[in-house]
Regions:
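Signature of exported/secreted
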Residues: 1-213
């Protein structure tokens, strides 16, 4: 859950947790994949996530999550097919920072959104460190998760009534450029670098204290 506390000096955004709370999240991502500069394919990735708040301590929550990832490759498959199931357990604090074992493959993006320690209002911007994590087992035979840092830019765009709900609207953007460390010689092709751009609009339900969409 996300809590947005309105005050005269602005809004303080923070997560809050209730022991035993359970909820589901569904996300869909559209991406264009390029290999060696040439477009390989476009795909839609559907994530269905179940979350169990197993423990709460000092304002942080220990979240036990099950991820079901499905994919639809445009021009090849008309329907989504199940790609992978994952389980992850991690702590997340009031601002959104993760404490998680490095062996977990999910979630792919960590510490996003990360809220400022003080209050914010529409028009404010900030930046914060985050992390991407990728599963290269199937395509490249890399058994451990690949981690690399990203720098995320945030803009508090506005407050908006969306489907009857008063929301705080954030624009979240970052670019990736990561050279993959050389691995032992292999007969399989290995990635040299990973580049990309992520842009998302994030809506927080101010009254309910939850992510709206």
């Amino acid at each position: 859950h996300l809590e947005a506390a309105d005050g005269g000096e602005g809004t303080r955004l923070k997560y809050r947790y209730a022991p035993g709370e359970k909820y589901r999240i569904v996300t869909e991502i559209s991406e264009d994949v390029f290999i060696n500069g040439a477009r390989s394919h476009s795909s839609d990735i559907l994530n269905k996530i179940s979350v169990d708040t197993a423990e709460v301590k000092n304002g942080s929550g220990r979240l036990d999550c099950f991820f079901r990832m499905s994919e639809r490759i445009q021009g090849r498959y008309e329907a989504f097919f199940l790609k992978e199931d994952y389980r992850s357990v991690f702590w997340r604090d009031e601002r959104g920072a993760f404490t998680i074992d490095q062996g977990y493959f999910m979630p792919v993006v960590r510490n996003v959104p990360l809220f400022p320690p003080g209050t914010v209002r529409p028009g404010d911007t900030w930046s914060a460190a985050a992390e991407e994590v990728h599963d290269l087992r199937r395509g490249y035979g890399v058994e451990r998760p690949l981690h690399f840092p990203v720098r995320v830019q945030y803009s508090y765009l506005r407050n908006e009534v969306r489907e009857g709900v008063n929301t705080a609207v954030l624009m979240i953007e970052y670019n990736t450029f990561h050279r993959v460390p050389a691995a032992a010689p292999s007969s399989r092709p290995m990635p040299d670098k990973i580049t990309g751009t992520s842009v998302q609009t994030w809506y927080g339900d101010i009254a309910a204290g939850t992510m709206h969409s």
